[in-house]
C-alpha cells in the first residue's frame, strides 16, 4: 500500500518580533559575533542573516512565548542553557532550514540543559517547532553527520509539542 508513515502532529507556535525585539536581536547578535570571533569560535553553515542574530531572535521568541525576559548577556557563559521556565532549563536551537533538524554538539551533557527547543527563523517571524527532553535527545543512537561533523540530531517530526513537554 502507499500509506504514508504516521508523523505526529505538533502544535507549532508562530511569533513575529516587534521593532524593539528585532533591534535587540540584531544588536545582541552582533555583540555575540564579536565575542565569538574574539574567542576563536565560528558559526558553521551559510545563512541569509548572521547565525548569532537568528539565534538571539529564536531565544527572544521562546522567552516571549513563556512570558519571560530573554538572557541577552554577551560573553562566554559556562552554563548550557538559554532560559529557565518552572525550574526547567532550556537550550534554544534556531534554524533557517525547513524542515529543520534539532542539532547539538556531541560534547553536550544531559546536565547542561533539561530540554532543547527547535525554532525556525524567517526573520522577523519565528516558529517554535517543538522540543525534546535532554535525556531522550542526547543518546548515541541520535548521533548523525549531516555534513558538518557528528552531532546529536533529530528530525523536526521527532519533536514533541511544548504543551506535552510541560505537562505537570
Q: In which residue ranges do the predicted regions lie?
A:
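Nucleic-acid endonuclease domains
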Residues: 1-86, 93-168
Amino acid at each position: 500500500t502507499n500509506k504514508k508513515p504516521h508523523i505526529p502532529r505538533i502544535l507549532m507556535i508562530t511569533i513575529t518580533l516587534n521593532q524593539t525585539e528585532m533591534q535587540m536581536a540584531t544588536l545582541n547578535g552582533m555583540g555575540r559575533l564579536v565575542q565569538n570571533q574574539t574567542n576563536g569560535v565560528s558559526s558553521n553553515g551559510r545563512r541569509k542573516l548572521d547565525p548569532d542574530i537568528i539565534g538571539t531572535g529564536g531565544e527572544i521568541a521562546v522567552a516571549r512565548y513563556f512570558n519571560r525576559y530573554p538572557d541577552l548577556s554577551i560573553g562566554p557563559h559556562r552554563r548550557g542553557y538559554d532560559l529557565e521556565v518552572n525550574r526547567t532549563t532550556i537550550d534554544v536551537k534556531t534554524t533557517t532550514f525547513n524542515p529543520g533538524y534539532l542539532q547539538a554538539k556531541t560534547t553536550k551533557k544531559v546536565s547542561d540543559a533539561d530540554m532543547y527547543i527547535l525554532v525556525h527563523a524567517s526573520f522577523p517571524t519565528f516558529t517554535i517547532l517543538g522540543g525534546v527532553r535532554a535525556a531522550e535527545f542526547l543518546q548515541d543512537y541520535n548521533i548523525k553527520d549531516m555534513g558538518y561533523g557528528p552531532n546529536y540530531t533529530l528530525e523536526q517530526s521527532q519533536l514533541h509539542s511544548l504543551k506535552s513537554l510541560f505537562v505537570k
